Each structure stands twice: as C-alpha cells, then as structure tokens.
Amino acid sequence: MFSPLTKRAKQSSRNEKTPRNRVPPPDSPVTPATQNRNNFISDRPATGTPAPWAPRLSVLARVSPGNNGDKGVDSDQLKPVFVGEFPQLLRDEQSYPGDACVSGGMDKETCLSWFITGSKVFVWSHLTTLPSRKCVVLELPVVVLVNEESGSGLQDGKSWLVNVVSWDTSAGAATRASRSRSPVGVVMCNRKTRAVVYWSDIFSGQEAAPAEKARHLIKRQSNGIRSSRAENSDLNSLITTAVAAAERLCIAIACSSNGELWQFTCSPTGVKSNQVQLNISSSSVSEGYPRSLIWRFSQGLARESCWEFLMLTDCDIHCFTIEPYPDLTVSEVWQHEIVGTDGDSGIKKDIASQKQIWPLDLQVDDQGKVITVLVATICMDRASSSSYTQYSLLTLQHKSEMRFADGREEKVLEKQGPIQVIIPKARVEDKDFLFSMRLRVGGRPPGSAIILSGDGTATVCYCHGSSTRLYKFDLPYDAGKVLDASVLSSTDEHEYGAWTVLTEKAGVWAIPEKAVVLGGVEPPERSLSRKNSSNERSTRDETRVTPYGVDRTAGRENSDIQNIEDKGNPKMGFTRQTARDEESEALLGQLFEGFLLSGKVDGSLEKLSQSGAFDRDGEANVFARKSKSIVDTLAKHWTTTRGAEIVAMTVISSQLVEKQQKHENFLHFLALSKCHEELCSKQRHSLQIILENGEKLAAMIQLRELQNMINQNRSARFGSPQAGSEDQVSCALWDLIQFVGERARRNTVLLMDRDNAEVFYSKVSELEEVFYCLNRQLEYIIRADQPLGTQLQRACELSNACVTILQTALDYKNEHQMWYPPLEGLIPWHSQTVVCNGLWCIASFMLHLLTEASRIDISAKSDIYTHLEVLTEVLLEACAGSTFAKLEREEENKGLLNEYWTRRDTIFDSLYRQAKEFMEAEIQGIRERTEATDEDIFRNRCSNLISIAKRHAGYKIMWKICYDLNDTGLLRNLMHEGVGPQGGFSYFVFQQLYDMKQFSKLLRLGEEFQDELLIFLKRHSDLVWLHQVFLHQFSSASDTLHTLALSQDEESMTTVEERTGPEPEDVQPTFADRKRFLNLSKIAYVADKDADSESKVKRIEADLNLLKLQEEITKALPNGEARNRLFRPEELIETCLNIQGRWTAIKAFEVFAWTSSSFRENHRSLLEECWRNAADQDDWDRHHQASTNEGWSEEETLQNLRNTALFQASKRCYGPTRVNTFDGDFAQVLPLRRENPEDSTSSVEDVLMSHKDFAEAGKLMLTAIMLGCVEEEGIVAEEFSSPME
C-alpha cells in the first residue's frame, strides 16, 4: 500500500553470503560514528543515533506548542513511537557477520519478544526500559540444527515456530504488568523436521528438554495424501497452553500443509508426539491447508476443565476441544463453513468474477466471541480481462455457547456484518506470499486489525461504519523488516492496547491510535507487499508527498473519523480541538509568556474572552489545558539510558521546583488579568482543576523528597560491601513508581521511549494513578512470600507515601484557600473513588498485619499502629469528602455512605483492640501499679483515636472508650463536642443506655442535653411517658401510655433506622406490657385530677377488657399464631366468625360491646353478620317442633331459650346488665325491632327474617332476643307477638 520513506539501496551487497570484511554492517543501528564513513543516507546525523534518524515524538513534545500550533495536524503525531531497543546481547550478536536468516515474534499474554539468529534465541520483555537486564539467551541443541540429508546446519530462523507458555494463571490485564517476573516456558518446533525443543522455565537457567527429531513424522504419510503433498508438509501454525503449572507440563498443537494435526506433550523430562485423527476427508482439503490454529479463549478465560481451539481450512472453521483427563484427548466439537453457497454464513463462492478464495488467517477476540478471518479472493476484471486480488475481513460471532450432538446440522457462527473489503483491487500475488500473511486483532483504535506480510510490511486496517482506513507502518530502510506485531496489553480490564511492532533491526515500536485514525488513507488499488504495481505511483513520488508513508489530507477528509476524535480520549493524552480552541490556547500561551517577561497583563481578559477562552468548562478549558501542560512538561535533559539511577539525580527535584514556580506565576497571571474572577464565576470546574494541579505538584515534590530520604536510609543500612546497589534502590515506593510509570507508558504510547520513573515524575496531573496501582498491584509490591518484617517495612513505606501525598495536597489547599472557587457539588481529586479504594487497600493490608500478633514483636506492631493511625485520618477524610460531594449534588449516596461507615468502624475497632494490647503490655512493665496509673496509660493510648473519631462520628469507639474508663466527665465532654445531625453523639449515648435498659441514667443525663433527649424520645415513645411524669405532665403521660399500649406493630418500639445493633426478631410488646401501660395510664389520669378523668378511665378499662378478650379468643388459634400481635376490633370479630362456635359467636358481641358507638356505626354490616351467625348456632326448627308437641309453658319457654345464642347476645348488648354502659347503646345503631313499620332503619328482627327457619320458628327467635333485653321477673309472653301474626 505505502512505500518506504527513503529509496532503498540495491540489495546485491546485502545478499552476499560472505561479507568482505568482519566489521559491523553499515546499516547497523549501533554502528559507531566515524567521520570518514560513506553516509549514503542524506539526513543521518554523524553521532550514530539509532534508526530512524527523525527525532522521536517524545523529544518533539518538549518544544513549545506555540511553535507549531498553526500547522494543523502535526506530522510528528502520525509517526510510530519508539518503545524499546534490542537487548545489548542481541545487538552484539547482530554485529557479527553471517548468512543466518533471522526471525522473531511477540507474545501478547506475557509481553515478551523473541528473536532467533543463528543457533541462539533471545527472549526479553519489550515493556521494560532496560531489556538487557532481563534478556535470556537460549541455545538450540546441536541435534536439531543438523539436516539429516545434507548434514549441514540449519541456520534459517524462519523455519522455527515459537510459542511462549505462561505458568501464571491469573486472569486480566491488570496482572500482566507483573508477568515479566513470572516463570514462563518456551516451545519451539521446526517447520520442516518437526523437531521440538522445550524449555520449561527460561528464567531459571535450566537446559533444554530432550529434543525429539521425529524422523518418522517426516517420512510417515497419512492415508489418502498424495506424495506431492507429503513433500510440501511444512508446519503452518503452533499453539501451546499450560496443563499443570506445578509440574511445568504443557501441550502444543501443530498443523501441517498436508492436512495433518499433531499434538506434542512437553514436560521437563521430554517431549511426546501424537497425530490427531481428523474426521475430515484429507482429499477435500486444498494444498497448503490447514493454515492456522488459535485458542478460542485467552489464557485467563480458558476453562480448566477443557481447552478449545480453532483451525482454519480452505473452506471451514473447525473447533476442537482437549479434555485433560485422563490422557489429553482431542475431539472435534463443531465446524462452520465460511466458503460455500450460503452467503449468510460466510463468503459465497461460484460468483462470476471469482476465480479462487483463499482464507489466510484467523484471530479471536479476548472474550472468545468474535472471530475475524483474513481472506484473499482472486477475481477477474471483465472489462480488461485481467486478474486482481481483493483482500477482505470476514467477522463472525458465536450464536450460543451450546454444544451440539453428533450429526446435528446447526450453525454455530453467524456473520457480524457484511464482509469488509479492505483493498478492492490489488496485484495478484503468488501462493507463497499469500500464505505468509498473518492477522492480528485487539488493538487501538477498537475494531482495527493489523496485517503482516511475508516480505516484512505491516498495515493497520481500521473500519468505522462504512469507511475503511489503512495505515502503513514504515521506517527507514535499515530498520529491516517487520517480524511480528502484537497489542500492548492495557492495565485496565477489557480495554484495548496500542499496536506494537517488532522490527528486524530497529527494536520495538508502537503505533499511536491517533496515527491510525488521522493518518490512515482510503484503500488503494495495490498490494500489501513492498513490490510495485502497474496501477500505483512511483515510490519516489509517494515519499515526496507523504512523510512516513502517511497522507495527511486524506486522513482529515472523513467526517466519521473526526467525530470520533472530537470526543477525545483522555487516557491517550490527546483531544481533538477546534480551530477556535487552538487559537485561544495559542493566544493564552503568548500572553502568559509576555507576562513572564514583562509582568504586564494589559487587555488580556478582553482578548481571551473574544477568542472564546471561557467557552468550555472542565478539562477542555484552555486555562486548564495550559495548567496541565505546565505540570506535565517533560524535561529536556532527562534520558532513558541511565535506568534506575535516575532516582538519584537532583535534576528531578529541581525540575519539579521549576514547574511549581511557573505554575505559581500562572496563578498570578490569572489573578492580575482578572481571569481568575471570570473562571470562579463561570468555570468553577476548570479553576478547580488548575488549583488541583498545584496540589499534585506540591505533593509530587514532597514525594520525591520522601524517596530521597528512603534511599539515604537504605544506603546507610546497606552500606557494607556485601550489599548490592540494586537492594539499596529497591523499595516499596520505588516499585510503586515503576507500576505507575508503566501504566502511564502503556496508556500513552507516546511515552514508551521514556523511563518509568521519568514518566511518573513528569505526569503530575495523573497523581491519582498512584492509588489505582496501589489498589491493583499491592500483591506484587508486597509479596506474600516475603519475610514478615519486610512486609511490615514496605507497608509502612507505602502508607507514609500516601499520607505525604494527601497531607501535602491539603496543606496546599489551606494555603491557597482564597484562590478556590465555591466547591459545592465538586468532588476533589483526593476524594475520588480511585483514591479511597487505594487507601483502603493498603489500610486493610496493615490491619491484616496487625492480626499477626504471635509473629510480630511489640515494637514492630507499635510502628505499624502509628502509621495506620495517621493513614486512617487521611482515608476517612477522603471518603467523607466523596460522600459529602455526592450529597451536595443530590446524587444517590447510600451505598457510598454505608461503605464509609463500614470502613470507619472496621479500622476503629482494630485500632482500639490493639491500643488495649499496648496498654496491657505497658502496665506489665510497671512495678508500682495504681488505678490512676493504668487510667493515664489508657488515656494516652486512646487520645489520638478519640480525636480522629470525633471528626468522623466514630460514636461506637468513643462510647467504648468512655465505658471502659468509666469516665462520665469525658462522656459529657464528648457529648457536648459531638454535635451532629439527629442528636449527634448524645443520641448514640442515649441509644446505648436504652439498649442496656438503664432508663434512669438516660433521663438524668438528658437533663443536661434536653434538646438531644427530645429528638431521641420522638423515636422512642415507650420512654416519652417517663419523661413526662418526671416533668409532672400526668395528662400527657397518660395519653402517651394509652397510645403506646394500643400501638400497632409498625408503630411500636424503636424504628428500624435507629437500631444500632442486632435486635431480637420479636420486638413487639407483650400483652402483659400493654396491660401495664394501660394501668399506668389509668393511674396517671387519676393523678391528674382532671374533670374528664372518669370517662377516660372507663375507656382505658374498656381497652383492658378488649385485651382480655383477645387473650381468650386467640387461645383457640393454632399455637404461636399472632399471640402477641394486637388485633384491631374488627379483626378480632372476624376471627370469632371464622372459628364457628357458640362461644366465639357470643364473644363477638362482647367485642362490639367494649368498643365505641362510632365503631358500631361504621361496622353495622359486621354487626348484622354477627346476628346471623348467632342464629345459626341453634336448631330453631327442633325448638319449634318441641314447643308445639310438648306445649311449653312460659317458664319452660324461658328456660329453653335462655341458653340460645340469640338470648345471650341480646342480654350482653341490650339488657339492663349489658357490658358497656358509658358510650351509648346498641339500640342507637341496630334496634331489636322497628317501632314504626314504615321506618327504613334496619333492626335485628329484619336480620333474623332472612333466616331459613324464621318462617316457622320466627316467634321463638323474637321471643329469645326480647327476653334477653328485659328483666327476667314478671315476663308476660303474650306481650311479644310476631308482626307476622
């Protein structure tokens, strides 16, 4: 697609097998500078700077933006970024002449690169800034380097397939930063001889495992395979995975061009091979297939029970699984046709213009859900009758995770979208070139892929919507070919990393996302190789137009790409600005530089306002961006060649001080120009960011001083000759700096050529990343296998660093308080969730160390206790700030508040327990002990804890300390100081006394805190009456007791929100409690001597009778059912009706009798139902027959009817001895009989008339109710006649 920047020299001299003299080749990047050398590169400097000679972007970033702000998209931003040099051992090996053909590769999981030259294999981490320190050189055994037929040595590095096996089973990108220290194995397999070499742990220095030459694998031919294919049976692909990490056992799967699939079991004792029998017909597989193998899931997501891998053939994708037990059996799970007659499932063949379809390679995303296939299609142009190649990407996704039974014809995959054509018309290449192409996915920008060709080119394809952009990675010619590409693993889970490229001679490079998005061009009609084509421009013309092979104008034509960049990506370190923003930022830079020179700010506010400098708020504001550029400036004289020694340089401290001075001048510029007032009123967030940059810069300076002090202390401690310098430099803070710098380098590839420490001390505005890495990487900074004393020391170092950062930031804020805008609703950076989580991570680890009481001496525990005490204060301040900001913004903060309370109480409880242990230890060391001495020791130990608890409402620990000291004076002082919402600490103390049932102490203490006591009593009504009695408010106390006795479940006792500890499941007052409350209420009414006290007392007595009735009635209910629950009168009556009995039928009327007339009026229908139920309790037809046959006299009638339910109900409700005589009678609601037949009022007689036996026994029914309502003496039966007569 693109051509190299510089025209390449003729290759004849470079292809000579024997060099003319034994000197390094002239194109070696490490060739020493010589003044008399023939420089055939015009722009190459005489200093021997490694290729390419153009300045690196990170160096150009030091230039003031004012110099190039008017150039649009800077071409330097579209260049690749240098990541790391080759290890020096590899450079030395490259300097020797020879005819060996080199090869190399990169592993995404372990971030390791490997390079084969001659008989040596170099393996190193391409992330470290000093690769030479971690470079491992592996020697290939002689037995695998001898060709059996010719006896010559095999020096072709391209004949080897290499895979790295990670024994670290941890999942996620967050742990990959530490994998360079983890043990890894290497498996190598020769494409031609099938020889396998295995190193189980390359970092341990052990020898290679016995190599299997596998002669029978070469000569053996499977059934159905022609001899011509057997000759071309090179292995195409190799994949490996760990089986048992402890035993260093792994398996490797390889596929060959003759359709065979081989399985190798590798262990430290040897390598075993086994051919996998495929169920596909060998004759149906085209020559050169299967092409590639790949695991369906990444190592972190792979299931331990089995492993699945995919195999690409000329028309299908096959999925296989490996069952680890009992003998690592490989079996096919499913297959999916990608080239066939069904265009919906893949690529439709037999189209008129198609001649041949070549699936070249496939890749799977990290989640194992999306499969991408690189496809080359040979087509015929009907107009010119010429052939051309069309390159495209086929994207498939899994429909489900189901496994299908044998013979079941269902599609497992489906097309994610239409096939994406990346090059519509290209030159027709030979088969070997097509098969040399490789595909990589998973890099930035999301959705992009990189295509590697056999001649050493790399092209990034970025498809966005209907648009496709191609970016060609190209360096000056002496960089050599591109050997492999990978993804720079991000430190964030489920995030994409930048593309990294391994070159033949220029080390490792990265392709920034911005370069791909802005520097990509439309797909041309040309090949992906370096060869020229008839329809492309000359190389010389192309290089004159596009530096580094990038057409800048084409990169800005597509509006979709620009829309993506307008949103920006802060983690990448760039945001697309409008022309107005760029003008404003340039103007601000000029005005500020003028202020630094002259001290004048004439008209700055008006000029900046007209330029739109105040249009944006937040990080996009030009003032905030200027502040960020000041604090994040890279020093010109910082280099990456000195590695860890950079921490000893005073230049870091002086550079930070220079930044601080410049930032202070920037604040003064804002104040004098009145821009500060404008920002304070309109862009509060922007002003907050500016001042927080000052906080972070001050904190970074103090952190640097802390590191200097740690280094000095360690130097004094390890000053003996036996101590190594590496031990002196290594400390917890240094390791944390490395992790933070590494994370910044990964997220911003423009910094990949910088040292971790340099990046850390330069990226001041991202200081909160310290706490992110502390939360994610603590287990690697403080390892479990380290001695306990070392863990303690490193934990204290990290705690001290965190406290230094936050305390310095708060001090800066206090000193510049007048500069800050109103912060309502703004979350400070030191109160963000990432900071709180990082602080809690180290605090919880220190709490864990404190629990190791038996293994830690008292002095070490005292040291960590002191550090934890200080750390607790800054942790709680951070959590409180986050919670209050959420509250001010009226956002949901319940979860955050609960987390804050939990962390606070956990730390306080642990610190208090430890303080008591220290007190006991101190007391044991005193010969003359007194009670006062013990108390003083205890107070001194707890003084700091009380101080912190007061500021963060640690009421629980404050109460414990006062209770254990038995100090009422201290308790009262804290109650006066602990003022807060809902009564503050006083409310908590009252609650504790209430739970302990010390009511008298509670009320006596409440005399001093009356307002707080009233708040408490509103939620504890069972104590209100006691307070009212104490104030001689007897009437109010009686009403309170009466209400309390009849309170329902949801109203009784303490509300759930106010409970501070676990409550019993049954917190309802019992019947005995309710009776006691009612009796106390009656006593209080009598003591009040109110004129209306008699009626109130009768009402109380009625309620007592209702309680008694409920006790009697609920005895008939099943055991335990609502025994203590207070029934409402209507519920009690309905219960009586449901029980269906004579006794309960009569009790229902008694319940009515003890209620009020208003209740009876409101429940008239329920009363009528009670009368119907009472009539049903007797056999009135039998009574009628007996009275007729036996001729009952008046006395016999009375004797027989007085036992009926109707008689008893009438007697209790209407008789002279009725139950309730003070609140009206039943006749007002439901009379026995209507006095006036024309009256519409219902009566008991009307209710009974609906009874089934009323027609015959109606007279007896009426007689029963009328007999019950009068005196029994002198009854005249004839007076009661039925209206039916």
Curated annotation (Swiss-Prot):
Q: Has UniProt tagged this entry with the keyword Transport?
A: yes
A biological process (GO) of this protein is:
protein transport
Q: Where is the composition biased (Basic and acidic residues)?
A: 523-544, 553-569
Coiled-coil blocks: none
Q: Where in the cell is it found?
A: Nucleus envelope; Nucleus, Nuclear pore complex
InterPro entries from the UniProt entry: Nucleoporin_Nup133/Nup155_C (IPR007187), Nucleoporin_Nup133/Nup155_N (IPR014908), Nup133-like (IPR037624), WD40/YVTN_repeat-like_dom_sf (IPR015943)
Q: List the disulfide bonds.
A: none
Residues of the region (Disordered) are 1-53, 522-580
Q: Which GO terms describe its cellular component?
A: nuclear pore
Compositional bias (Polar residues) spans? Answer: 31-41
User: Which family is annotated?
Assistant: Belongs to the nucleoporin Nup133 family.
* Name listed for the protein in its UniProt record: Nuclear pore complex protein NUP133
Q: Which organism is it from?
A: Arabidopsis thaliana (Mouse-ear cress)
Q: Which gene encodes it?
A: NUP133
